[in-house]
Swiss-Prot record:
This is Non-reducing polyketide synthase afvB. Its cofactor is pantetheine 4'-phosphate. Residues 1456-1603 are annotated as: C-terminal hotdog fold. Pathway: Secondary metabolite biosynthesis. Residues 1295-1603 form the PKS/mFAS DH domain.
Amino acid sequence: MRIFHFSNKFPPDDLADLFRRLRLHSKCPNHVILARVLEEVTDVVREEIAELPAELRSLLPPFQSILDLAESFNWHQGPLSGTFECVFLVLMPVCLFVGRPDEFVFRRDTSLFTGLGLGFLAATAIVASPSLCSVPVTVAEVVRMAMRTGLLIYQRSQDLEPQSLDGALESWTSIVKGMGEVAVREGIDEYNSSTDTPQPSSIYISVVEPDGSVFINGPPSRLRKFFSTSGKVQSAAHAPLPVYGGPCHAPHLYDHSHSSWAVKKCRAKVLSRDLSHAAYLLSMADGNPLKADTVLELFESATYILLTSIIRWGDVVNAITASSPLLEKDMKLQVEILRPSPVVDGLVSAIQKSHPGCSAYVVDLGEWIFDDTHISPHGAHEKIAVIGMSCRLPGGADDLELLWELLREGRDVHRKVPADRYDVDSHTDITGKQRNTSHTPFGCFVDQPGLFDAGFFDMSPREAGQTDPTHRLALLTAYEALEQSGYVPDRTRSTRRERVGTIYGQCSDDYRECNAGQDIDMYFIPGNYRAFAPGRISYFFKFSGPSFNIDTACSASLAAVQIACSVLSRGEADMVVAGGLNILTGSDSFAGLSKGFFLSKTGNCQVFDDAADGYCRGDGIGSIILKRLSDAQQDNDNILGLILGSATNHSSNAISITHPHAPTQANLYRSTLMQAGVRPQDVDLVEMHGTGTQAGDAAEIESVTKVFSPAVPRRSQPLRISSVKANVGHGEAAAGITALIKALLIFKHNEIPPQVCLRTTLNSKFPDLRQLNVHIPKKIIPWPRLPGRKRYIMVNNFSAAGGNTSLLLEEPPARPDPKGCPQTRFVVTVSAKSTVSLIRNLEGLLGFLKMDPFVDLASLAYTTTARRMHHKYRIVVHGASIQEIVKSLEQHISIAETQCAIQKAPTIGFVFSGQGSFSQGVGRQLFQEYPPYRNEIQRLDEICTSHGFDSILPAITSRSSDILEISPFMAQLVTVCVQIALCRLWRSLGVIPNVVVGASLGEYAALYAAGTLSASDVIYLVGQRARLMQELCTINSHSMLAVKATIGEIRHTVRNNAYEFACINGPRDVTLAASVEDINDIQQTLVSQGYRVAKLNVPFAFHSSQIEPILEPYNKIAHSVIFRNLKTALISPLLSDVVFDNKSFPPSYLRDSTRGTVQFSDAMTKAQEIGLVDSKTVWVEIGVHQTYTGAMRANIPNLEVVAPSLRSDESNWHTLAASMSALHSAGVHLDWNTWYKPFESQLRLLNLPPYQWNLKNHWIQHNGDWLLLKDKRSRTGYERSPAPAPPPLRTALVHHILEESFGKDGGTVVIQSNVTDDEFHAVASGHQMSGRPLVSVFAYTDIALIMARYMYSRLKSGTELSAMDFGKVRVFQGLIPRKDRSKPQYVRMRMQADPMCSSMPLSLHRVLDDEMNEEELAIGVVTCGDSHSWRDEWAAYSYLLTSRIEALHQLADQGLASRVSKDLVYTLFKNVVDYAEHYRGIQSAVMYGLEAVADVILSPSQDSRWTAPPHHIDPITHVGGLILNAGPAMDHTNTIYIMEGWESMRFSDSLMAGELYRSYVKMNPANDNSGFFSGDVYILHGNRVIGRVREMTLRPLPRILMSRFFDPPDSQYGQMAQQEPSTALPSTPQHTSSAKTTESTPSQQDESDNTSLATPENENKAPISGSWPNANSQLVRDAIALIASETGVEPDALTDETEFSAVGVDSLLSLVLVEKFALELNIDLQGSFFLETPNVCDLKAYLEGNQMTLR
């Protein structure tokens, strides 16, 4: 007898090692089943991930195999942890099981299966598999079932107690030992009852272990409350378990519908299998065999038990031991497990105890995984799909249709070299005698290769002109190909930008050598070197996959495609942009190829012709988009063709390196065919390399006929051969991609174009082609699809260097016509980066629709929204027919030129309306026709029924004509459920609110949207509130009236009736509540006075005295829910304020909001006052009807967008289409892919007109005859004048230069100082902690500024250094001098600088005893700035600071704040740090909470070498440390606070000894670090701010650890710290950017704050006097002219709206402009000014706003 057990835990081994071993074994031939399991599971997981909401999908990295996720994705954390734990707990044991070498035979009478938790589901995979071969598919479906179960549990957890996507996980399960099930259950029942816990949120038992231990489950917050308040259970031994996924084993939360949902997507062929003879699987709930005749019944039963039953392993053991027929007296019982398990040990013991004669032993089936003997990896192969392509080819073939037209017409487009390349007459000599000339004037050329849309690609005209046109055209064609492919960044798994590669072939640099090289400028390198061609594409599109530039001469582009296929097959990328580039601009290559007798003297390539005399050079740019076939099909891409095989070899046996070799070529074809599994006779067309050289053509025809059409056996079907070079020349590096594009067009058009250039007779060296059934098409040959036979094309591309590459293409798979989708109204979008392109794109789309008015509207909408990259200029229309769309688009043509660009995504608000306009059947159409919305409503309905409420579905699915009485209770419940579902729908579409507000009933949905209440809590509260109203209030005795009048007008007009103000929605939008009689009278009175009124269809007068009977019972119910911290700001109409945290809600908030007046208008006013919302905020109204649009517009003047979610008077599709149009037009990033996902398989990506570029000619003309002369005359050199001597560096802290280097790229200096030196040690001695010297971190400021000044003097000699800022400081360890000063103790300081000294990163390191290794102490960055501009900036709020300082002193005078003297300050400080007298600058201080001000007088410096003396910087700033370490607001018993760093330290004036300063700071808890505090320290001299330390941050440290952390390195603790550097201080959090930096380099530092500190040399500089000219002044005109000159843009084109990035101002050009402004306009700007100043308008504003400080 064999018992197989599957555990609910991972094996005790190293899990990462197990996954690694599974990967290795899966590649071995003897583990084919294991490999298939992983492949099938990967496919299933991908399918399920595709169905996840976008916010969850975005958490997952790209993966090629499920093992990639297991190894690289942290699935133990985050919201999907439970879901993927389900996946891997099923996958791991099954993989171990199928890998074992035993026979796969399990009979019912000899085999028994058991399992716990997810292991129970894993066991079903084996029980449901009739054979080993069936296991992979079965396992995949069990993993699907497990994943859906995990997702179901996650969804339920979110409904009950949601967690943020990046929040810490909390346990849902605790174990209680020593009490027993009965006692624990009594404690649980008592708690649930006494706290009125809603049933779905109740605490329950999930597991009872054999030893009596009990697992208790529940929402984490309630579980904590239970153990802190529940009497007996509280005192029992208990502990949380690592169960984070959510609630399971919960019969009150799940039923059979949930287990059916988990199983329903499994494949029918698996579910229908018969299990009548399968082995038994014992229930983990009671030990009884599961009764299942089919796999469907087995899966549903197992899932139901998992979701609803308590696990009782003891009952399973009892059931086994009680099965006497199974355990005969002398039977050998084999218990087979997958790695050791204590649970099984208990089973074996129980069997041996109950059946002493039974021999039971345990077998580990997983041991095989550790046997590495037979590991021998092999690879896999998948077809590669071409899904997009574009080209620029000779003869005007600037797009695919023009190319096809050229081919069909059989045109030969060779011509003389055009004048824009070079002077063909002077550079051509047909005799070949003249030096460096070509013997042919002919070539094939792209028209105007300089045309480029520089603004689209964020390049200046200057940069564009200096950039090789091949690079520019590569950008254009790459975009066009991507657009044709429907690429949208990160839309799907295979379009994740980090997984997209760029690979291009290129073999010449004509433009660099002959054009740009004539006058080398700043963009010469990035604009022309080959690596920048694919690199520029990757950079622009933000692709992070492999980027290669390939040069294999003439075969470069097809070699690039082959490498791209390999990259995809190996899983190194999921999508690749590939192609070839060749633009001929210089005569050198013409001359060289002529001398080598490659080129034809007579014209184009005479392919196959007996008179062929060489090839004709040609331009060519081609780009294609590649994906694996499975990914392309998954993404609903259009497949243009399939690459079945690709290979490259080398003709090493040829007679010379440039000579072809037919046998090698033939071997290549065979290899490619074998790889693809295709017979040679199935290939109907070979697109040959066919250059028109005698040797090349003869060798290729020999190899082709030998393989594809030998004499014996003769082909039955004709083989056709052709070569595109006869049309457009030999594109060299672009030749292969040109041939490939031609082949794909042949598939598309189902015909073969004629071959041209057979001027004389067929090449006499060819065999008899007719006899071999080989044909050269001389006319258009139809080549339609044939049923049962696929079409194949072989594409050849050979290299003059000997390389040969071939691709085998298969026709694209046929696809049925689109079926459309149930939507009745669709959004169509057009966008561009310029108004010129916008108009042209609009015209192009209109032309397309007029030519094909029967195009599928749904597919048109899908293509223009979900399958397009959207730009800042947008036209958005919606309609129900193509005719309506055309009409709307035509109306937009006239206004397109005035369209405003979207500068940034707007803030988004959700407004949740009340109940006032409820009607039955709300959202019925959306429910019936849009599955995601239906799923959400059904999920919420389950919550309703779990609370004991009636189902909401009848009220939603009923029609208005149906006779269905909707109770007030149901109306409220439906309303809030619809709002929650709509909120989730909008969020799934990428519409994430920044702020939410709800009116009346809508506030409950707003609390859900803000994250403070769960969906379950909201439904429970609304349902209970509605129940109380029905029970305690009289229906229809009171009513409500909406009035368009002010409160004053109403009071003046209505004097004889009793009423209350229920809602004040706007200045003239008020809702009254009163009895029905009074409401009727009031209505008549107001109407008679001309006021607009509307009586609301509500059964109660909400927010009035009618509701008072429910308040106290409802308040008790409301206290049973838990308010969580908000994730989104909430505007509270009750509080008339904005709420940012849950502490702002008073205990009676829900009670008060039920009765209190809805102060909607005041709340919205408050939100505007604090800047949270404005007229640009985009609002989405979420409710059963559009009722709050008027109120929003009344409260926010000039509000632009309020988009409703539903309207009762129109189709749901119409409402949503209009709203989505408005949102998209406003710049909201809608997830259109998610919107169309349910219907995507029924839609098609349309081949619409491509993007219409705003082209301008950017071209450097080649001039002169210097290429002919090649002048090599030597030039005399010159001596550089010696650089001025740098200033001396020796100071107390900076000792000697260890190394330095300076050059054109900047400089580096390394300083080494001895800490035990007397001067250095004296600095440390003035600042002691735990009685030990510790160098003040503010000493680093002096070091930084001294080194920065030195570097500035070396790099910018003769240029005055104005002011410096030392910022981005992060302190990792303290610098503590040794006790033993007999030996040196070194510290090293490294500083780097760019050539402009705009950023000078510094890192400080302790040198270890071996003097080889170092430990990092701190990092920071010095930047240069303008002290006068800081002074002006600070002046704007000086009065606020002085007012606050005076207020603090008044509080101290009143005894409300603490005033402390100097002596007391430093007495208090001694508990943490003991300052020497010269550090004791604070004379007195006032502390109030976390706020303080100190009077400071600085001690004089004895040493004149200081730049920023630490005994000045420390006392002027340590008021923040005083608050935290000595202030009354903090508990100092167990914690001290030490310096973490600061973001910026700058002073406009030098600090002077003896002067009185005031330091003010308010410390606050740091947002991103628990326990940290930060604040801005302001330093005032008089009433003027002269310094600021921004975001000075202190971190907590347990006081008990002071001795350890501040012991000298040569003490016991200090030596331990040196051995373990990471413990020198508590580790800096991972997410602090500077803390990640191991070596401070310019590229690693954040340069967003280029600010500085004043130095003594410039502190007295006076600003320029006089008024500053306005924006039309000569200076502004000079500034515009300078920018125009440097960018190459016409001055008139630099309008106020022009963005600097759009004209190519990048980091490099920004530095150039800053330097030019300083030199030519005498204006000093920060190095990143033009990166941080968006446009010309902002530049003008800056010039005007800084008129007194610019110089």
